Amino acid sequence: MRELSKETSLQRVMRASGRVPVQCSCSVCKQQCHTPYLGTPDDIERIIDAGYADRLALTNWAAGIFLGVINIAIPMIQPVAGKEYCAFFENGLCILHDKGLKPTEGRLSHHTVRKDNFNPAMSIAWNVAKEWLMPENEDVLSRVVNKFLNARKP
């Protein structure tokens, strides 16, 4: 009997948020690239493997507390914000796009999400953040933390 395929982090976030990957280059969507997008543990592992650990940081995602979807901050490793923009924003573009490394929040984000149609439980950011708490991500979480710490050793 064939084993059922395991749902990926991207598939779980897509299902929970109701979003699908989009490619839009309108001015509103381009503006979103100024702020770091959240990545799942799988996304962050690919970014580390591509040699960008120096543009990542340990962080606690607390937005969920303010959204009312969780009562604790979620520890994770994410892209850092530079002085003005995301650490991956160079010469008016995100360098991760063409390398296939765009974090899940960025892959699913689109200018159609507005304050008047925002549902915190379906938020892309919340559903990406939940991936850092999922027991099924235990192996990738362990690898990500080890790779991140090893890459950051002096």
Language-model region placement:
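Short loop/turn segments that flank or connect secondary-structure elements
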Residues: 1-154
